[in-house]
Amino acid sequence: MSNVSMRDMLKAGVHFGHKTRYWNPKMKQFIFGARDKVHIINLEQTVPMFNEALAFVNNVSSKKGKVLFVGTKRAASDAIKDAAIKSDQFYVNHRWLGGMLTNWKTVRQSIKRLKDLESQSTDGTFEALTKKEALMRTREMEKLDKSLGGIKNMGGLPDVLFIIDADHEHIAIKEANNLGIPVISVVDTNSNPDGVDYVVPGNDDAIRAVTLYCDAVANSVLSGREQNIVVQAEKDGFVEAE
């Protein structure tokens, strides 16, 4: 299983929080001090807390659980998508639509519409339409794909949410809390950790830091999946030849 070291975090700038005047007092216990009016996060807490979260992801994945990566702000969007694709998981990286989890029945209908449009775009249906109608359907498909493309094959609610920026994604956290879905989130010094089951105190704006978190979670998913394959092979009686 992948672990992240203090050195990895220092190199990525995980310890740099926000300006002191923007702090959230609920993050006080995770702050080491301040330098040039910027809060410094105590990585001696972040390292074990993040590694505990990674162990949880590993465990969920070893049981074929689904991980939903969420990060809709610009600094997180690409890394969230890349990590989810790398680990064959699911993502929301543009806008969190209210009810994405709590109103799954309606979301499922929109996903069905997206898949229908995708089929139409390849089976010749679009070619048979007027230019205007084909353009309208293409635009509808692109809009749906932007919102739902990352979860279209999720096939039900996720088993855990991994989030970059707890404040920015507070609606997702609230929905997960309502449904009893565990939440792992990077929480910066200006954010509220309430509702987060696995708090990862750290910078949520620096691309290198965000990429570090996302890659580590993706690697934990992959190692969990490998464990599942080994266990299944043992159950089925497959033994490697000497």
From Swiss-Prot:
Matches recorded under InterPro entries: Ribosomal_uS2, Ribosomal_uS2_bac/mit/plastid, Ribosomal_uS2_CS, Ribosomal_uS2_flav_dom_sf
SUPFAM superfamilies on file: Ribosomal protein S2
Molecular function terms, GO-annotated: structural constituent of ribosome
One cellular component (GO) term of this entry: cytosolic small ribosomal subunit
Keyword annotations of the record: Ribonucleoprotein, Ribosomal protein
GO BP terms, alphabetized: translation
KW NAD (keyword) present: no
Protein's UniProt keywords contain Ribonucleoprotein: yes
Signal sequence interval, chain numbering: none
PANTHER family reported for this sequence: 30S RIBOSOMAL PROTEIN S2 PROKARYOTIC AND ORGANELLAR, SMALL RIBOSOMAL SUBUNIT PROTEIN US2M
Membership in a protein family: Belongs to the universal ribosomal protein uS2 family.
Name of the molecule in the record: Small ribosomal subunit protein uS2
Species for this entry: Colwellia psychrerythraea (strain 34H / ATCC BAA-681) (Vibrio psychroerythus)
Gene name per UniProt: rpsB
